Design a protein with these regions (language model features):
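Conserved beta-strand positions in repeat-built beta-propeller and related beta-rich domains
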Residues: 181-185, 234-238, 278, 292-296, ...
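Residue-level detector of Asp-centered blade-edge/turn motifs that repeat once per structural unit
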Residues: 174-176, 227-229, 285-288, 339-341, ...
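Gly/Pro-rich loop segments of beta-rich domains
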Residues: 150-170, 196-221, 251-281, 309-333, ...
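Short, internal strand/loop/helix patches
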Residues: 81-109
């Protein structure tokens, strides 16, 4: 395309983690305007690619993230900031609350990257997750001056997240005396007592993709957990891999995944890297299979532990909501999973819905929500009228008909009695901050309060909600 000076940003934008600035001020170095949505895993992937490129080429590229809300909760500055920081974003973020910047630049879908050269001229647009980003950025930065000392020392984020024992925890698993936490922002998995004392740490805390013992292994933004006897299965989301922790030996190994996103391949795997995965997020174990909510390709997959084989169970791959059998059904970024008695329960995040999949026949049906990918709300009641907003986690005990739901966008814990019950909100003393992980065990619902960097315990008998103080 012919290079031309680009539009300026709106006059009074909302900056979430940086001082207000104009595009004019950023001239002198190449700049990417990244139009994204914080709830989209495709956007999270593009942002991770940009951050990786900046780390490899310090001082050469500036990035401004333009957050365009899909959900009502994302219009709240603090919630939008937390979501993006949860993806590891530290670049300046502009909240385009009413889509003004989106319209000004003529954006049609997210993620869209608008590439501006050092003179403020638009050179290219990359739409979606296809296209050679590395090649485009190399060409964009070609010929510009070497970065100065000031360029190499980027301005620190305004009001950074506090340094706490946990950072954006997500997946949980629990037994009668143990609690397992995916400490996502610290790239590790913790084994704790119910009181919060850390017994073991799996993953040394630096983002990497390494198998090995307790002090050697490494994860990258792990999320979903599923426990089966002495094996803990981990959705190593940032590495696009399915990992396994042997709780007797502490050994971590990779069952499937290459460390990079890609199209999964059905069939037996000769070795772990024989098939890529695409943003695995939720896990459940049933019938010697690890069920995988593959948020990046909008399908439910399974990994056969006996045959070391991958199978696509349900979903077309299109981001839609449609009931039906197996590959006739469609999901909208499935996130959380639970399974019991030959049924898998799925949190369909962008569909703001709860779906079921029969493990015999793979028939998919909608329990709550499912009216469309832009239909959401905060409403209890019969299944046909109840509403959720971007639910991310689901849990149930094997001996109870109660389904527990982390209604992430609404900051609520919801429950649904199986067999015809209505959706109800659990009365808590306060609204939760981005809950994105659940487990049920030992008379309690364990909640990963992700945006607050905390884990909570909700006592089923007394209704008491308290913090689990994590102590290393």
């Amino acid at each position: 395309m012919t290079a031309q000076l680009t539009q300026e940003l709106p006059e009074f934008p909302t900056w979430l983690n940086a001082r207000p600035s104009t595009l004019q001020e950023h001239r002198g170095r190449a700049l990417v305007l990244a139009f994204v949505n914080a709830s989209s895993v495709w956007c999270a992937e593009r942002l991770a690619e940009l951050a990786h490129w900046q780390a490899r080429s310090p001082g050469r590229l500036q990035v401004i993230v333009v957050q365009v809300p899909r959900f009502d909760s994302e219009r709240e500055p603090q919630r939008a900031l937390k979501q993006l920081r949860g993806h590891g974003v530290s670049a300046p973020i502009l909240l385009d609350r009413d889509w003004e910047t989106w319209r000004r630049f003529g954006i049609e879908s997210w993620p869209t990257l608008v590439l501006l050269d050092a003179y403020g001229r638009e050179r290219q647009r990359l739409v979606g997750v296809t296209g050679d980003l590395d090649k485009a950025l190399v060409a964009l930065c070609e010929g510009q001056q070497l970065p100065s000392d000031a360029d190499l020392h980027e301005v620190a984020e305004r009001d950074p997240e506090p340094r706490l024992e946990l950072r954006f925890p997500t997946g949980l698993a629990a037994t009668e005396d143990r609690l397992y936490i995916a400490d996502t922002g610290h790239h590790r998995v913790l084994e704790c007592t119910h009181g919060g004392r850390v017994l073991r740490q799996f993953g040394h805390g630096n983002a990497d993709f390494i198998d090995g013992g307790v002090g050697e292994a490494a994860f990258r933004r792990p999320q979903g957990l599923a426990l089966e006897r002495d094996q803990l299965y981990v959705a190593d989301t940032g590495n696009h891999a399915l990992r396994r922790i042997n709780l007797r030996s502490g050994q971590v190994d990779t069952l499937c995944g290459t460390g990079r996103s890609g199209e999964p391949v059905e069939g037996p795997l000769a070795f772990a890297g024989a098939s890529a995965l695409h943003y695995p997020q939720g896990l459940a174990v049933a019938d010697n299979q690890v069920l995988i909510a593959m948020a990046g390709d909008n399908r439910i997959w399974s990994y056969d532990l006996g045959r070391a084989a991958l199978s696509a169970r349900a979903g077309t791959g299109a981001l839609e909501i449609r009931d039906g059998s197996g590959h006739l059904a469609a999901f909208a970024q499935p996130a959380g999973l639970a399974a019991v008695q030959q049924v898998a329960y799925v949190c369909d995040g962008l569909g703001s819905s709860i779906r079921t999949m029969q493990l015999r026949g793979d028939l998919v049906q909608t329990l709550v929500g499912g009216q469309g990918t832009w239909q959401f709300g905060d409403e209890d009641g019969p299944r046909g009228t109840a509403r959720l907003q971007f639910p991310q986690a689901i849990a149930l005990a094997t001996d109870s008909p109660m389904l527990w739901i982390a209604d992430t966008g609404n900051g609520r814990l919801r429950c649904l009695r199986l067999g015809g019950g209505e959706l109800t909100t659990v009365l808590l003393p306060r609204r939760l901050h981005g809950p994105a992980g659940l487990a049920v065990a030992a008379g309690a619902v364990w909640i990963a309060e992700t945006d607050a960097h905390a884990v909570l315990r909700y006592d089923l008998a007394s209704g008491e909600l308290r913090d689990v103080s994590i102590e290393e």
